């Protein structure tokens, strides 16, 4: 697990439960179509796996 991940929010948080909202905010995403880069590690991958319906992930 090396390299970086490009994570983009593609779905809105309206109507989502609080746990999913907190995960998205913890990743640093604040609005739709916003993109952030994180290192590829187990903590980040665990967060992404809980909200695959809200984000897209690409390796950089």
Curated annotation (Swiss-Prot):
The lineage of its organism: Bacteria, Pseudomonadati, Thermodesulfobacteriota, Desulfobacteria, Desulfobacterales. Keywords: Ribonucleoprotein, Ribosomal protein. Belongs to the universal ribosomal protein uL30 family. NCBIfam families: rpmD_bact (TIGR01308). InterPro entries: Ribo_uL30_ferredoxin-like_sf, Ribosomal_uL30_bac-type, Ribosomal_uL30_ferredoxin-like. One of its GO terms (cellular component) is cytosolic large ribosomal subunit. This is Large ribosomal subunit protein uL30. It comes from the Bacteria. Part of the 50S ribosomal subunit. GO terms for molecular function: structural constituent of ribosome. SUPFAM superfamilies: Ribosomal protein L30p/L7e. Pfam families: Ribosomal_L30. One of its GO terms (biological process) is translation. The gene is rpmD. Gene3D superfamilies: Ribosomal protein L30, ferredoxin-like fold domain.
């Amino acid at each position: 697990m090396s390299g970086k991940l490009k994570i983009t929010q593609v779905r809105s948080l309206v109507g989502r439960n609080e746990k999913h909202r907190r995960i998205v905010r913890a990743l640093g995403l604040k609005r739709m179509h916003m993109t952030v880069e994180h290192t590829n590690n187990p903590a980040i991958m665990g967060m992404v796996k809980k909200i695959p319906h809200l984000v897209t992930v690409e390796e950089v």
